[in-house]
Amino acid sequence: MKLTSPIFNDQQKRRAIIWLSFFHIFIIAASNYFVQIPFEITLKLTALGAANDFSFHSTWGTLTFPFIFLATDLTVRIFGAEDARKIIFVVMFPALIVSYVISVLFSESKFQGFESLTHFDLFVFRIAIASFAAYVVGQLLDVIVFNRLRQLKTWWVAPTSSMTFGSMADTFVFFSIAFYQSADPFMAEHWAQLGFVDYLFKLFIGIILFVPAYGVVLNVILRKLQMLVTERVPA
């Protein structure tokens, strides 16, 4: 279904943009908390004859943040690229504040008390700036790529491509700003390798889970919109 008819009036579009903006901020807040909770994945390569198993660390934030790419792609599909960009520009400064506040309040995934906000944390602020820049660059690139490809007949090409390039930009911008020549010696030395592994894992999760989720949600939305259009057409 090609969405060319004015299905939504201006008030409905404004309401949708407001709710989508809150959804973006919620996901950013949740991701800034869950990114502090790590887990380890071990691939038993020795069972296949390899000399060693392969292990890597990630965080639960890797699983929550792609919801923003899902929401952005659906926004471009339903409302268009212009409204998707509006949401990004509305959200980006609240996202900066939320990123800093959540990271300070829940340092190492433990509540530090509201008094922690009375002390400015430069290290955390740098991470918040990195999160801010990564969100803006990654989402704008996601909109550009998806908008260029959304008219293709093969539905999965647009979300897969936009998530691939958007996540790449998001990951590189975040790790380079947050940890390049960081006060943390380990992160300063290994940020590129850690970012690359993080990107591969996010890409895997995105393609396996979020691209199919995009297809399912889009089909549901299109059926609802088709019913709405049919009801409006005079008999």
UniProtKB/Swiss-Prot annotation:
It is found in: Cell inner membrane. The chain crosses the membrane at residues 17-37, 56-76, 87-107, 127-147, 155-175, 201-221. GO terms for biological process: pyrimidine-containing compound transmembrane transport; queuosine salvage. Keywords: Cell inner membrane, Cell membrane, Membrane, Transmembrane, Transmembrane helix, Transport. It comes from the Bacteria. GO terms for molecular function: transmembrane transporter activity. Belongs to the vitamin uptake transporter (VUT/ECF) (TC 2.A.88) family. Q precursor transporter subfamily. This is Probable queuosine precursor transporter. It comes from Haemophilus influenzae (strain ATCC 51907 / DSM 11121 / KW20 / Rd).
